[in-house]
């Protein structure tokens, strides 16, 4: 049976909507919202009914009846750290995300899907939600007391690509070790060991390779000196770390196509900077090969920049000796959400009940809780 699955992903200025039926894409669109309309809402949570109405209008325009949908799935922000996998979206999930203190439309994913599920009597699922945290304890330690690493990566696309690669080997995701590098606006690399992301960089907190618009790892002292110099506000420093650093800060654009055009025209600085991003990506992959003790079945490049054959080829030259390198250019979040819903409906993957309890709340050593803040 080919299930019909509706998926969605609410973003800052748009909402992605897609409907899949088996291998067929019934519809897929990115609905742009009028900035003037968005400006009328004080908080992201206040946009809930507006986004519901917008999605319904888009579905109606595409001739899709909600009654034809077998299940709902999508990008569900605000759930906090959990293990990866599939969670049933219920009132507990919705209450948590709407009151989590996060002021970003990503928190509306679960409530929108739940509303549709309530209206039609069909299930709704959160698949590999963005705050998934499966790090090994040893990967959390830093040398700065009180600062511990957490996992913030492109989890839905990361895991979907790892699953696809495992399928290509005729194996299950929990049977392989894979390193996935998502290179888009942000850049996340993760070591997947037998179905768990046991080590990652953190695209929100500013670690790992620099990205098209994020700074990545930088020397700590110079940043501290900048922060306390009185010449830069907290917002300015945080902005470079998370929004205006990386390629954008160094080259004035985060468009890989435009940068390659500059390189082709002889721009030596653009070439060096772009190569440095590939170099750092390869270094992170190499580090995670060590985390997997060299037992790596494959390296997957994904995200928009992974459509650039030159970028992928550079990384492959650096790390191809570790394991085969394949590129799945673009992102597969919508497809991954749909595939997860199908696995839930078919019973090939367990569906978990969300409790709101974090997957990591500190270190538990010999039965004792280490006195740290999660």
Give, region by region, the residue ranges found by the protein language model:
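Conserved phosphate-binding/catalytic loops in two-lobed NTP-binding clefts
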Residues: 309, 313-339
């Amino acid at each position: 049976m080919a299930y019909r699955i509706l998926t969605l992903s609410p973003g800052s200025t748009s909402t992605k909507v897609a409907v899949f039926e088996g291998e067929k894409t019934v519809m897929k669109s990115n609905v742009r919202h009028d900035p003037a309309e968005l400006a009328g809402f004080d908080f992201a949570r206040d946009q809930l009914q507006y986004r519901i109405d917008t999605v319904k209008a888009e579905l109606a325009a595409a001739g899709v009846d909600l009654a034809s949908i077998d299940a709902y799935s999508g990008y569900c922000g605000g759930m906090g750290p959990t293990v990866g996998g599939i969670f049933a979206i219920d009132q507990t999930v919705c209450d948590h995300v709407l009151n989590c203190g996060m002021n970003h439309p990503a928190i509306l994913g679960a409530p929108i899907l739940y509303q549709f599920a309530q209206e039609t009597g069909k299930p709704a699922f959160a698949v590999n939600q963005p705050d998934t945290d499966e790090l090994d304890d040893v990967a959390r330690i830093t040398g700065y007391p009180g600062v511990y690493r957490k996992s913030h990566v492109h989890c839905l696309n990361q895991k979907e690509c790892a699953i696809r690669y495992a399928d290509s080997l005729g194996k299950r995701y929990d049977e392989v070790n894979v390193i996935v590098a998502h290179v888009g606006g942000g850049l996340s690399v993760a070591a997947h060991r037998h179905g768990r992301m046991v080590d990652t960089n953190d695209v929100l907190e500013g670690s790992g390779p620099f990205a098209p618009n994020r700074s990545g790892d930088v020397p700590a002292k110079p940043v501290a000196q900048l922060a306390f110099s009185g010449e830069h506000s907290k917002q300015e420093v945080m902005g470079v770390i998370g929004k205006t650093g990386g390629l954008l800060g160094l080259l004035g654009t985060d468009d890989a196509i435009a940068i390659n055009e500059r390189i082709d025209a002889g721009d030596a600085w653009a070439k060096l900077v772009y190569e440095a991003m590939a170099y750092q990506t390869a270094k992170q992959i190499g580090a995670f090969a060590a985390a997997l003790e060299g037992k790596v079945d494959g390296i997957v490049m994904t995200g928009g920049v992974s459509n650039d054959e030159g970028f992928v080829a550079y990384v492959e030259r650096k790390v191809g000796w570790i394991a085969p390198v394949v590129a799945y250019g673009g992102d597969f979040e919508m497809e991954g959400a749909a595939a997860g819903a199908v696995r839930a409906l078919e019973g090939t993957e367990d569906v978990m009940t969300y409790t709101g309890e974090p997957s990591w709340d500190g270190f538990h050593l010999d039965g004792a809780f280490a006195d740290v803040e999660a």
